[in-house]
């Protein structure tokens, strides 16, 4: 069995800004970014950096292999042991592996160095210069590193095996319904021994610890240095099927037996499910047609960039689910396996993607894109959540020959009818199109499915994608667009929510089978001096009004393990003197009653108009006669009974700070570090948020955690936020905040 040594701690790091000006070594743990990021992507660092650590391995059995697994390293990486270069890797979003067997001696302390370069490189996807890019890349070893010790007779690693359509363990659902299911298990076995080895391969599927299906191959003999694929089928009766509403997962245990002894074993989670895409039949999961609401996500987190540990990735997935979304497009690059695991567990359907945005380079770049497509499928093929593979460069002109290579790579790597490639040019299995491009109602190509990849942003920001991204020429009026920070006030937040209301209604009236609004979180970008404020949550994951609109589109009966749903109601106003007297209430209830200072203002049903008629739950609209300070209370009713309640109170003078640590009850596992946002809310004597407050707040920590970035922060819309890094093993840390006069 493989012995995995996690190498996330005890690294030494330095930046090499020039050949003669290396910075001093500093001790760091992974995941790590080589710089503290500002919120807008303006103060990025680019250059060479090095990670070094001591590596000492115990005595090994004969012919064992020792393989270094790097989760991701931005952009290019050189691997050295004791100063000797062993490998170079190009590509910053996918894992790579290096066989260190011949470089490591038993019991000897070796020096492992990874030298990274995150500078612009037109040959490495995404290829486009950072200063022209509508997102950010960062740098460093921003995912985990492991040393995997493989026995002589072993199951290979999917990435490094280099097998088209194979390598490692590949599981596919061949058929599935409520009565039965058939799963294919393809296992790649290699004999690194100097003598032939005889073995059998066993595959077990377990549900809640109980074996629900098992298969054992006949005995095979493998010559020295040879490898073979063993493919078997497992039958399940009355299977637990994976779906967004019920994301049932099995544990697949794959074992190699020599006689009665297990010599290697792998365990992974797997969902039994079948997806389908067609214009006539829509998007189906296990034969059931679903019309899922979705979003787009960039994987960055403030201050730390891409260096988000497991718990932070899971929190983002939970935020997406709780925002009312059951589908997410990973824009525009492969994202963390931890995030993918969370989507598996929470029931979030995923459009996976290779790196690319508005750029297509030369032959070397295109070869790298095809290799990225292959490696992406090999990495993510066993994830239940992945329904679509964007093996295409987003919003990029591509030749027919290049697109044919990308499409073919997907089908070669994942044979059968469950591979659905997609792209913004109609050359793939599924056509993905953005609402601003104007064809979501008119496009048709036989029975091919259409997915609205993006909506709710660009169509309100610029007339089309042809505006000048450098000068801003052609951008529509700011008041009408969807790009609004929380601090811009109530009118801006209402406008964003209204835009999304209209846009979602329009996409639901189209023949599209899935849709994804742009975007779930605000994000930094290279080409613009300010971060993009198009998220339904800001960059610190604080909600805007539009977040609650999407929450309201989920039915009141929906809830699940690991996330909160159910009946909800939200009054979309700050209820201050300048507030609009027409008040929208977002709710998934049948009726809503609004009261002001205890006086009923009416009980209404949803406001169904030509702009809301296709929504599952249109907003409720109340026209108030005048402003009166105090408390607005909305009560939602289902079946005549109160099901949800929300109150908004006119803010008075700031009185105190309230601190919240945004963990969402998701904790790091033992031995893991964490990154979490901490918010200080400026509230009045009644606890109402003072949305106009912009006070400076000073944060202090105790107990071993550290603030990443500034400790003195100006509040936006009454909330000041910082990012805290928590080292592995630190559990009892404290945070305090103070502001003048509070």
Give the location of each predicted region.
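Substrate-binding/catalytic cleft of secreted carbohydrate-active enzymes
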Residues: 317-319, 327-550, 563-574, 580
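Beta-strand-rich structural segments
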Residues: 185-188, 254-255, 583-587, 635, ...
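Active-site-adjacent substrate/metal-binding segments within catalytic domains
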Residues: 33-57, 61-70, 74-81, 87-90, ...
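Accessory carbohydrate-binding/adhesion or oligomerization-edge regions at the termini
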Residues: 1-37, 115, 121, 141, ...
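Short flexible loop/turn segments that cap and initiate beta-strands
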Residues: 197-202, 244-251, 588-590, 594-605, ...
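Short S/T/G/P-enriched beta-strand
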Residues: 555-582, 588, 643-677, 683-686, ...
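Accessory beta-strand-rich segments of carbohydrate-active enzymes
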Residues: 3-5, 12-17, 42, 46-157, ...
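Extended acidic/polar, glycine-enriched regions
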Residues: 105-109, 186-278, 622, 648
């Amino acid at each position: 069995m493989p012995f995995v040594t996690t190498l996330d701690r005890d690294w030494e790091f330095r930046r090499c800004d020039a050949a003669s000006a290396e910075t001093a070594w500093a001790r760091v743990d992974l995941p790590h970014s080589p710089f503290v990021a500002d919120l807008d992507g303006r103060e990025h660092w680019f250059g060479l950096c090095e990670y070094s650590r001591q590596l000492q391995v115990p005595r090994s059995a004969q012919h064992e292999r020792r393989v270094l697994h790097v989760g991701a390293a931005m952009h290019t990486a050189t691997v050295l042991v004791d100063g000797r270069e062993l490998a170079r890797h190009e590509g910053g979003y996918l894992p790579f592996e290096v066989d260190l067997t011949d470089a490591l001696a038993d019991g000897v302390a070796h020096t492992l160095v990874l030298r990274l370069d995150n500078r612009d490189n037109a040959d490495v996807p995404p290829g486009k210069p950072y200063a022209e890019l509508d997102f950010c890349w960062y740098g460093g070893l921003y995912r985990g590193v492991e040393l995997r010790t493989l026995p002589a007779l072993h199951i290979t690693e999917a990435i490094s095996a280099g097998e088209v359509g194979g390598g490692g363990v590949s599981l596919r659902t061949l058929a599935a319904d409520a009565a039965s299911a058939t799963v294919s298990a393809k296992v790649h076995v290699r004999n690194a021994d100097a003598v032939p080895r005889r073995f059998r391969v066993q595959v077990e599927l377990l549900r809640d610890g109980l074996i629900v299906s098992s298969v054992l191959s006949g005995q095979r003999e493998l010559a020295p240095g040879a490898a073979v694929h063993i493919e078997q089928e497992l039958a399940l009766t009355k299977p637990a099927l994976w779906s967004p509403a019920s994301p049932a997962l099995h544990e697949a245990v794959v074992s190699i037996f020599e006689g009665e002894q297990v010599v290697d074993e792998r365990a992974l989670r797997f969902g039994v499910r079948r997806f389908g895409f067609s214009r006539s039949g829509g998007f189906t999961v296990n034969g059931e047609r679903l019309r899922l609401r979705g979003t787009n996500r960039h994987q960055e987190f403030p201050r730390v960039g891409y260096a988000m540990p497991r718990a932070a990735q899971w929190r983002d997935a939970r935020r997406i689910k709780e925002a009312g979304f059951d589908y997410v497009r990973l824009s525009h690059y492969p994202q963390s396996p931890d995030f993918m695991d969370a989507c598996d567990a929470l029931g979030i359907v995923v459009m996976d993607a290779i790196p690319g945005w508005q750029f297509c380079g030369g032959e070397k770049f295109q070869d790298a894109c095809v290799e990225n497509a292959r490696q992406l499928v090999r990495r993510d093929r066993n994830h239940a959540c992945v329904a679509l593979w964007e093996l295409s460069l987003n919003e990029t002109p591509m030749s027919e020959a290049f697109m044919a290579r990308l499409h073919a790579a997907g089908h070669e790597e994942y044979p059968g009818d469950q591979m659905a490639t997609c792209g913004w040019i109609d050359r793939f299995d599924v056509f993905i199109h953005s609402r601003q491009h104007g064809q979501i109602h008119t496009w048709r190509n036989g029975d091919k499915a259409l997915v609205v990849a993006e909506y709710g942003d660009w169509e309100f920001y610029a007339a089309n994608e042809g505006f000048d991204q450098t000068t801003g020429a052609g951008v529509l009026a700011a008041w009408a667009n969807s790009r609004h920070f929380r601090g811009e006030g109530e009118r801006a937040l209402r406008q964003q929510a209204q835009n999304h209301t209209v846009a979602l209604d329009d996409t639901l009236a189209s023949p599209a089978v899935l849709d994804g609004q742009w975007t779930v979180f605000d994000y930094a970008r290279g080409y613009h001096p300010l971060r993009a404020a198009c998220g339904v949550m800001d960059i610190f994951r604080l909600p805007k009004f539009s977040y609650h609109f999407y929450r309201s589109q989920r039915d009141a009966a929906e809830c699940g393990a690991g996330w909160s749903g159910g009946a909800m109601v939200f009054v979309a106003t700050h209820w201050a003197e300048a507030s609009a007297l027409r008040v929208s209430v977002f709710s998934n209830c049948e009726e809503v009653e609004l009261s002001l200072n205890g006086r009923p203002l009416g009980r209404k049903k949803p406001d169904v108009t030509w702009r809301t008629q296709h929504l599952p739950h249109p907003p409720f609209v109340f026209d108030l006669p005048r402003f009166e300070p105090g408390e607005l209370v909305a009560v939602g009713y289902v079946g005549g009974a109160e099901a949800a309640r929300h109150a908004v109170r006119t803010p008075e003078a700031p009185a105190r700070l309230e601190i919240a640590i945004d963990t969402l009850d998701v904790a790091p596992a033992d031995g893991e570090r964490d990154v979490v946002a901490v918010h200080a809310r400026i509230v009045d004597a009644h606890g109402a948020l003072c949305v106009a407050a912009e006070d400076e707040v000073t944060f202090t920590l105790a107990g071993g955690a550290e603030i990443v970035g500034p400790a003195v922060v100006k509040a936006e819309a009454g909330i000041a936020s910082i990012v805290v890094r928590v080292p592995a093993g630190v559990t009892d840390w404290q945070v305090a905040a103070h502001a003048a006069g509070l």
